[in-house]
């Protein structure tokens, strides 16, 4: 989602609160809970899950392995739920021609660097760069090259833009910032 006027362009980024992340966290939680319950029911020797008889699974080694997978899945699921609740990766890109500044803000993980805020002068921007990697896992990323610093990615890694969409976005941004486009 973006908002644009003659002198200001604001690009809002959704972060980790996406439907796919909610679905994966929920599916992983239910699956790992099922594995853990089967492992516990094989240890206790009674059915905690009614549609799956625990007598068919002996505790050593199947019950232990299923319990381990269940615990590992719960840890991964809790990690996903934490990134969703903290909304890691969300933020905005602000391009202000009137003031001559670019501000990039992202939310990170809790701690000292939770808020990631970068500010640059527009005159320090060398170019808008498109990096294309073709193959099985095709990847197209839009970068902003800044003098004296490394390139800053402007698109998310999971954002699968078509070549036409990434070119259009790069052309609009380069026109707005009045900088050239580079393709790698």
From Swiss-Prot:
Q: Answer whether the UniProt record assigns the keyword Plastid to this protein.
A: yes
Q: Which N-terminal residues, if any, form the signal peptide?
A: none
Primary location group: plastid
Pfam families according to UniProt: Ycf4 (PF02392)
- Spell out the family assignment given in the record's similarity comment: Belongs to the Ycf4 family.
Q: What role does it play?
A: Seems to be required for the assembly of the photosystem I complex.
Protein name (Swiss-Prot/TrEMBL): Photosystem I assembly protein Ycf4
């Amino acid at each position: 989602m973006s908002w644009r006027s003659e002198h200001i362009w604001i690009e809002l980024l959704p972060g980790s609160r996406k439907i796919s992340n909610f679905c994966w966290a929920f599916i992983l939680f239910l699956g790992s809970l099922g594995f853990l319950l089967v492992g516990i029911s094989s240890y206790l020797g009674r059915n905690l899950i009614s549609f799956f008889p625990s007598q068919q699974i002996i505790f050593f080694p199947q019950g232990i392995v299923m319990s381990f997978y269940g615990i590992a899945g719960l840890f991964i699921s809790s990690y996903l739920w934490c990134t969703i609740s903290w909304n890691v990766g969300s933020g905005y890109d602000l391009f202000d021609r009137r003031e001559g500044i670019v501000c990039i803000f992202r939310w990170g993980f809790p701690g000292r660097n939770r808020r990631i805020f970068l500010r640059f002068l527009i005159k320090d921007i060398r170019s808008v760069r498109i990096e294309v990697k073709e193959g099985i896992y095709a990847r197209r990323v839009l970068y902003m090259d800044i003098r004296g610093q490394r390139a800053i990615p402007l698109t998310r890694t999971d954002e699968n833009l078509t070549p036409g969409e990434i070119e259009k976005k790069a052309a609009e941004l380069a026109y707005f910032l009045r900088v050239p486009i580079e393709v790698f």
